[in-house]
From Swiss-Prot:
Domain description: The transmembrane domain is sufficient to compete with phospholamban (PLN) for binding to ATP2A2.
Source organism (scientific name): Mus musculus
Entry keyword annotation includes Lyase: no
Official protein name in the record: Sarcoplasmic/endoplasmic reticulum calcium ATPase regulator DWORF
Tissue-wise expression: Highly expressed in heart (at protein level). Detected in heart and soleus, a postural muscle group of the hindlimb containing the highest enrichment of slow-twitch muscle fibers. Also expressed in diaphragm, which contains some slow-twitch fibers. Not detected in the quadriceps, a fast-twitch muscle group, or in cardiac atrial muscle. Not expressed in the prenatal heart but gradually increases in abundance postnatally.
UniProt gene name: Strit1
Length: 34
């Protein structure tokens, strides 16, 4: 149980960064093309 609690925040942070980076790229592409 303790291992899952310690690893889940470790996984959430990179996932949020990846999602934010992808969304940012999509916004930039959308602005460039439109």
């Amino acid at each position: 149980m303790a291992e899952k609690e310690s690893t889940s925040p470790h996984l959430i942070v990179p996932i949020l960064l990846l999602v934010g980076w992808i969304v940012g790229c999509i916004i930039v592409i959308y602005i460039v093309f439109f």
